[in-house]
């Protein structure tokens, strides 16, 4: 059967985030309890204007990516509890690896493998777990990306990531170094 790209708007629940950190053996779904996971590429620019020009110019020189997050404390969710503990214990330098899995972009001919992106993040809580009377315990902050993202595929059954190139038009995947 020929690959057909999705022809409708992709919804947030179709991009899953799995996370792993020191002390756990397999990535866990960072879903229940997280109410917002908004990426900000934050491009860095070198701006200027030459004396003979009317308009300023701007050249992108890199990125300072991060994720702003918010959520609710659900103690049986391993990822949410990890984020809560980092904030409440005022831990510094706590990292995790995130796999953003595009379930709308399956690997042609596979079962349970999808296009994915791997990033390393430091947890920087701003609200470590508090809220108003009668309300839910809220979590808010930033996941600051460290280093470059890697691109490839993710197997949701066994939690493995393989670096490579996914073709969004054909659904095909080539592992890095294969057929290059």
Q: Language-model features: where?
A:
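Solvent-exposed edge beta-strands and adjacent loop segments
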Residues: 2-74, 121-137
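Short secondary-structure transition/capping segments
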Residues: 8-14, 144-159
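Generic hydrophobic, helix-prone segments enriched in Leu/Val/Ile
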Residues: 17, 34-35, 83-91, 142
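Short beta-strand and beta-hairpin "edge-sheet" elements
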Residues: 32-37, 101-151
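Extracellular/virion structural assembly segments
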Residues: 54-120, 148-156
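Short, highly charged low-complexity linear segments
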Residues: 74, 132-144, 158-168
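Intrinsically disordered, low-complexity terminal/linker regions enriched in Pro/Ser/Gly
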Residues: 154-180
